[in-house]
């Protein structure tokens, strides 16, 4: 199927465009699909869609190591525009004197929102084998680091939110971290 501009000033069709077989492809990069608008405005253009996997790593904020099992360290992601959704079932293979924050990798760096923009993250995490903290309310909370491709864990007690560290959670072999996170990127 070929679509061509008819006439020197023709810019559109008078009816819907239906593609019954094949894909809609652009001849050059940096093009997008404009939704819900009659003009080509950046705010209404989807120019980035990607699905894929990344190798999740777990590092220690202060010292030591924590290694994930190679059979349980692949995360899946979908990126639509600036919104990223990730999920993974990560399991610990081994640890060696881990200390400090638990830092999990992400496939893309997160945005650093301006004061008038909510660019944060939202996520859930279920763990097996880890130690709940004194007065902990609910599960661990994945907290995406702005301007970086990683997240740390926090927990809440009755009055505040606190960091989860290797030291106070007591991680070991076969501990499991299942997470789903949504966050924004700069582009």
Protein language model regions, located:
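Intrinsic low-complexity, repeat-rich intrinsically disordered segments enriched
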Residues: 1-62, 87, 94-96
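Short small/polar-residue motifs
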Residues: 14, 67-78, 134-141
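Generic beta-strand structural signal
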Residues: 19, 28, 79, 144-146
């Amino acid at each position: 199927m070929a679509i061509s501009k008819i006439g020197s000033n023709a810019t559109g069709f008078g009816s819907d465009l239906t593609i019954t077989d094949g894909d809609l492809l652009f001849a050059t990069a940096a093009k997008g699909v404009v939704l819900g608008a009659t003009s080509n405005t950046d705010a209404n253009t989807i120019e980035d869609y990607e699905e894929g996997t990344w190798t999740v790593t777990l590092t220690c904020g202060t010292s030591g190591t924590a290694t994930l099992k190679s059979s349980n360290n692949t995360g899946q992601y979908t990126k639509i525009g600036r919104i990223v959704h990730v999920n993974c079932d990560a399991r610990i293979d081994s640890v060696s004197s881990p200390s400090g924050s638990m830092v999990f990798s992400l496939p893309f760096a997160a945005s650093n929102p301006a004061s008038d923009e909510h660019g944060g993250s939202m996520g859930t995490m279920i763990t097996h084998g880890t130690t709940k903290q004194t007065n902990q309310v609910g599960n661990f909370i994945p907290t995406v680091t702005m301007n970086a491709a990683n997240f740390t864990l926090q927990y809440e007690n009755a009055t505040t939110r606190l960091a989860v560290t290797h030291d106070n959670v007591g991680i070991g072999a076969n501990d499991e971290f299942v997470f789903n996170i949504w966050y924004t990127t700069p582009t």
